[in-house]
A protein has these predicted regions:
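Conserved catalytic motifs of ABC-family nucleotide-binding domains
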Residues: 20-38, 74, 135
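Hydrophobic anchor residue at the start of the ABC signature
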Residues: 84, 128
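ABC-fold ATPase nucleotide-binding domain signature/coupling loops
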Residues: 2, 53-82, 97-100, 104-107, ...
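C-terminal portion of ABC ATPase nucleotide-binding domains
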Residues: 41, 49, 58, 114, ...
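ABC nucleotide-binding domain signature
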Residues: 7, 13-17, 126
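Hydrophobic/aromatic position at a conserved helix-loop-beta junction
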Residues: 82, 88-89
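A short, proline-enriched helix->beta-strand linker immediately N-terminal to the Walker B motif
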Residues: 89-93, 122
């Protein structure tokens, strides 16, 4: 990694953080912040994968719909889908979602995960999350406790072998059932 060209490395990685950084301007301009020369077709494809296509199709002006600073005229989940689309328009080899889907409901999150697995560029997705629902279908889950790795495996494997994961899983399941 140390010998790898930083610019080349950054071109292969898309990062979406919990903070939803949207700018005053059109949907098109906000998505092109991820790839300046993105065509409308590429933008629509990124929006579709990010589960934001229908939302934008319903806005007057569609790609020319003007977002307020920080996307204040969108809901939290809509803002998250927009920032995910911005990262996807670059077709990164690695996509890091740092609690980036925390405002998505379970169905939208599941649809996003399915769409990411079926993209034509199939990125490696690294999801950082405190929500079991966001990661339970991941190929590999790494469980941290106070900065230490205490478990690694699939959801089913961790439920059998990692007490920390099982406690988190059970507590979140109880909240969903309540």
């Amino acid at each position: 990694m140390r010998d790898y060209d930083t610019k080349a490395l950054r071109s292969k990685i898309g990062v979406v953080s919990q903070k939803k950084a949207l700018f005053a301007g059109t949907v098109r301009d906000n998505i092109r912040f991820g790839k300046q020369d993105a065509t409308d077709e590429e933008i629509w494809q990124a929006l579709e994968t990010a589960q934001a296509k229908q939302m934008i199709e319903e806005k007057s002006g569609q790609l020319d719909f003007v977002l307020e600073q920080e996307g204040k005229n969108l809901s939290g989940g809509q803002r998250q889908r927009m920032t995910i689309a911005r990262a996807l328009v670059r077709k990164p080899e690695v996509l890091i979602l740092d609690d980036a889907a925390s405002a998505l409901d379970y169905a939208t999150g599941a649809a996003l995960n399915k769409a990411l697995r079926n993209t034509d560029f199939a990125p490696t997705v690294i999801t950082v999350s405190q929500r079991v629902a966001a990661i339970r279908n991941a190929d590999t889950i790494v469980v941290l406790d106070e900065g230490e790795i205490v478990g690694m495996g699939t959801n089913d494997e961790l439920l059998r072998s990692c007490e920390v994961y099982k406690e988190i899983f059970d507590s979140q399941l109880e909240k969903e059932d309540a």
